[in-house]
Amino acid sequence: QTCALPISRHLEVTRDIAIKFNGTFGPVFTVPDAAIAEEVAVVPGLDGQKMSKSYGNTIELFGDLEETRSRIMKIVTDSTPLEAPKDPGACTIYALYKLFADESARAEMAQRYRAGGMGYGHAKKALFEALAAEFEPMRRRRAELEADPAYVEGVLRDGAAKARAEARKTLDRAREAVGIV
């Protein structure tokens, strides 16, 4: 049983079932809480809306790097001139950059935006570089795993066996609480 789940309808249904069951038969299931950091509750898409596959505004983290660069370079911006100060808080590029850059890099970009002289093209390039650097180790690991499907199958088999054992314990407790032992 888990104590926290990402926010979704699954979380709501899981909570409802656990509360109803526990109220009827006693404390068997853990009632999960939402586990999502406030700063990433809504990730902006390339068009500034909430990032969503259905909106077609996503960044494919494991996709082709040139395609990713191209998509980032197409982020819609306003017509503020390069030399003019900009508000980082009102910029989709900066909102995405904050997710991948460290604190000093975020502060530096925000300062450069406010001072003027930093164009959106510069910011898009910095965003791409931060994203590529952040996900490079994961891209390498994914390539290694794709090259060894037998290993992946073994990990999945082992994980399934562990999950079945844990699920069995919970199911046994639920059966006992209901009286189906």
List each language-model region with its residue ranges.
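Short, small-residue-biased leader/transition segments that mark boundaries at the very start
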Residues: 3-5
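Conserved nucleotide- and phosphate/pyrophosphate-binding catalytic cores
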Residues: 8-9, 15-181
